[in-house]
């Protein structure tokens, strides 16, 4: 059976929708694009008119009632932001906006500026009302940024939408976050083949290929977005929410294999910047996730449960 695909640029990412050819496949692609545009309007921290930005604009003013999808992602993000030693913090928006790494107006904030902004990045300042589905940022100038989670969450929503249409197989690649569902009918073992980027080399160079089925692969790396300041130093985009500066780490890339793409987002962010020992121990302790760690000097570490998926 022939694969058909549609690629669009949205939310600062290239998005691939891959389905097997079937009746009305082009209309299905059109409907998915409409959904993606709707989710951009809901989750984006870079669109001043998005539903998320309505929360941010009302920081220190009043609670904002939001769609259940947005509320659920914020609720999930807050839980994992408050976890011990987590490097995920959805309240880090002011720090991200200060650096702007990945945008044309990127800069290096002053230390005084960063220290002042850190005072309004405590996720405890996010007040949630489950019955009303309202979100209130209790400090002025607070900002939620869901950039570490939204792509995976949206990919999962799209997969659920396609399954509800009765579509049995497909693949979504949302800016490098890959989620598959159903059998890969074009492969004898019915598994999809996903290349894992070598973070120490140019894009398209893989450290391995993974065989996956009804699973997601999410990779985070310091190679993705960088900025060279007037001081001549190069800064990557993965910020440490505790210091306000790019995380200092021996890790160049971290890949998480999970059932849900949002879980891959959560754990790549929670773990990136931890020691290799901590990351590998966590991967062995949590049965729902597997992973691959690549260091800046090119060493590769695999969790035990992922080894039978690796094609080198």
Protein language model regions, located:
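Mature catalytic core of soluble alpha/beta enzymes
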Residues: 1-312
